[in-house]
Amino acid sequence: MTDGDGELVYEYFLAHVTHEGLDGAPEIMRRDGAVSDVECERGKKLRREFFARFKTRDLLYFADVDNTVTRRGILSDEKKRFFNGWALSDRVVLSTGKIYKSIEKTARELGVDKNPCCCLNGAVLYDGRGGREIVAKLGEKARPAARILREKGLPYVLYYPDALRVETPLGQKDYENLLRYDEMYLDEKGETDFKRVVKLLAFVDEGDSESEAIVDGAAAAIGLKALRTAPHSYEIVPPLADKGRALKITAKRLGVHFRMTAAVGDSMNDLPMLAVCGLPYAVSDASCELARFGFAVAGSDRNTDLPELFDKVSRGVL
């Protein structure tokens, strides 16, 4: 990717990405008063330039369904419209969601379940031609971290791709928290599908700084980070780089279908993942949310260029 290409992708990222013919982000932002008429026209020009540089056939478009699949497995109309604006063969579902069955339902709803390759999440690749492949394989990798937690007397459970393993005594509160946690992840029958989650879940109350430090250290020991997911628990999960790796594997598996010139996502949290991959990128819903990352937004003098972004990602700032 040349500097010019990078600048083009970055600028296009600021303008949002959308397929020609749809109600694109520049128009939406103008309608909402976020950009001026001049800025809107510039955004549309950048969109045309982007697709002139990175032809549609060279793009890997993916839908991140993390915050779209509800407990009832309902896909938002907005994402349906956006996703359906692309050729069927150019669609891949990429998600770190935990409910595989619900995500599979979404894949069917989007018509990609029979595609050559569909990434259900950062840990599992689903190939319509041959079933699943576990990519992250966190189970064994989590062993050193689990040992640290056990030696320090912290309760945890370890999710393998095929089982939930309770390896430390759980108090009544921990057990209740586990049940409450698992209620979030229901399959199509309304049953908790906790056997298909690839992560280490540690039970630590928010504000218990000593225990929090232990969990952080345990995660760091295996090169991962601990994520606070609830007031009572931490997750140690594969990092965004693993999700990006799954995206690369997906593109490679697709072979002649994609040359991975660029990737187009639909969520702000796709940004660091794509940056980790070292790919030209664009996302669909960037707007004032960019201010959180120090990016330029309409009417703002703040700016962050691509090299600084990649530096932030490499240092784990994003």
PLM features: what roles do these ranges have?
Residues 5, 9-63:
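Non-catalytic pre-domain segments flanking phosphatase-related domains
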Residues 18, 31, 36-39, 152-155, ...:
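Conserved acidic, metal-coordinating active-site core of Asp-based
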Residues 18-21, 25, 29, 51-56, ...:
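Mg2+-dependent phosphoryl-transfer enzymes with acidic/Ser/Thr/Gly-rich catalytic loops
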Residues 57-58, 89-90, 114, 197-198, ...:
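Short, well-ordered alpha-helix to beta-strand connector turns
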Residues 72, 76-173:
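Active-site phosphate-binding/coordination module
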Residues 110-113, 121, 222, 276-277, ...:
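Short, structured coil segments at secondary-structure junctions
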Residues 114-120, 134-135, 176-178, 280-285, ...:
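Short hydrophobic/aromatic-enriched beta-strand-loop microsegments
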